[in-house]
């Protein structure tokens, strides 16, 4: 058994404990939490805050490493770097590609998950079944959903396929949405100009997320709310959002998080090798199109707190909400029975002081 004592615990579900607080870890799980005097032998973390490890459900790359193209060893090393930085679970994300390219990419990512099963929850396929708001996705690669191809992919890779972003207009009749959701794959709506009613219809067919709210979708208009309006108001849909201050104005980030306590913050981080260039926390194609961010999950949390969101709530958007959105219900919480993926933070700056994965310290 390992015990940790800190000033307070941010539970991941929006709560903050009394002070002092402690937790006990056994066999990779949190077995007890409490306040007041800590168990004998507890490691004293002083005035630190303990919180769940951060969860990123949309990360395309890190540094110079593109998760769709790099080698297994390169991807593992990049994910390890992000884990040491406080992100203890993630979904490596693949953007639109020719259908015959997916087997090679997924074979590599299956090997990555085999090497890091405690960290890699699965894979997020962002495309190629996208619609009228392609963003950085090459339009020539976009296509109507191929239900048989998706079924074959899920048969081959099983629960490696954790999340699929598609556009309702690329899934007429919602066959792909229904088929994926029936298999336990989370379906997100994105890169779409679908109208409000169409977005609701897709949610009724099984979609439960809206990928990077306000980006890759039609605008929010007071008479035509579109996908943004559905993501903000139709409760079966949970919005994710990139809080770098570039993809979405900070005022609208705050609006979205206030409107949807269950919203998820993501990095949408990409590799910053040519032709992608990084500037002010965002990544751009040569023509100026936004291609993602260069955030870490801890950066994302700190930026949300800078908007006036309380730390416990910012942590919820980056932990419990993210894990719940993809069915990883034993993560993202500091509570008995949850996985012992925990971070320690400075109480004033939220700088990282320590990381534990499966109860093992990485520092």
Question: Which role fits each region the language model picked out?
Answer:
Residues 230-238, 259-345:
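His/Asp/Glu-enriched, well-ordered alpha-helical/loop segment
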Residues 57-60, 80-91, 131-158, 200-213, ...:
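Active-site gating loops and adjacent loop-to-helix segments of metal-dependent hydrolytic enzymes
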Residues 60-62, 76-105, 118-132, 157-171, ...:
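Divalent metal-dependent hydrolysis catalytic cores, especially in the metallo-beta-lactamase
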Residues 150, 155-273:
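Active-site core of metal-dependent hydrolases
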Residues 125, 180, 210, 304, ...:
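Conserved, mostly hydrophobic/aromatic
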Residues 3, 53-55, 123, 188, ...:
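Residue-level marker for buried hydrophobic side chains located in beta-strands
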Residues 1-38, 360:
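N-terminal metal-binding scaffold of metallo-dependent hydrolase/deaminase domains
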């Amino acid at each position: 058994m390992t015990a940790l004592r800190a000033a307070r615990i941010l539970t991941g579900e929006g709560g903050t404990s009394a002070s002092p607080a402690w937790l006990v870890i056994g066999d990779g799980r949190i077995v007890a939490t409490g306040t007041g005097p800590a168990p004998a032998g507890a490691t004293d973390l002083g005035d630190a805050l303990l919180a769940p490890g951060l969860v990123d459900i949309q990360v395309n790359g890190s540094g110079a490493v593109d998760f769709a193209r790099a080698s297994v060893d390169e991807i593992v090393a990049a994910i390890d770097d992000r884990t040491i930085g406080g992100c203890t679970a993630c979904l490596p994300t693949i953007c639109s590609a020719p259908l015959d390219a997916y087997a090679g990419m997924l074979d590599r990512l299956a090997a990555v998950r085999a090497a890091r099963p405690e960290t890699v929850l699965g894979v997020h396929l962002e495309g190629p079944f996208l619609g009228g708001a392609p963003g950085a996705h090459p339009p020539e690669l976009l296509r109507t959903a191929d239900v048989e191809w998706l079924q074959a992919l899920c048969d081959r890779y099983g629960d490696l396929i954790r999340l699929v972003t598609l556009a309702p207009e690329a899934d007429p009749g919602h066959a792909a949405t229904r088929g994926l959701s029936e298999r336990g794959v989370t379906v997100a709506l994105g890169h779409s100009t679908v109208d409000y009613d169409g977005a609701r219809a897709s949610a009724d067919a099984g979609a439960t997320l809206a990928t990077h709210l306000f980006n890759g979708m039609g605008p929010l208009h007071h008479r035509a709310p579109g996908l943004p309006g559905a993501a903000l108001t139709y409760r079966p849909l949970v919005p994710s959002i990139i809080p770098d201050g570039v993809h979405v104005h900070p005022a609208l980030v705050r609006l979205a998080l206030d409107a949807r306590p269950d919203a998820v913050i993501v990095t949408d981080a990409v590799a910053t090798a040519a032709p992608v260039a990084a500037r002010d926390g965002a990544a751009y194609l040569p023509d100026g199109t936004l291609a993602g961010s260069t955030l870490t999950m801890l950066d994302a949390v700190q930026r949300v707190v800078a908007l006036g969101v309380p730390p416990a709530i910012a942590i919820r958007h980056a932990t419990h909400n993210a894990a719940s959105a993809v069915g990883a219900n034993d993560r993202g919480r500091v509570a008995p029975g949850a996985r012992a993926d925990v971070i320690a933070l400075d109480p004033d700056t939220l700088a990282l002081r320590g990381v534990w994965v499966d109860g093992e310290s990485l520092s």
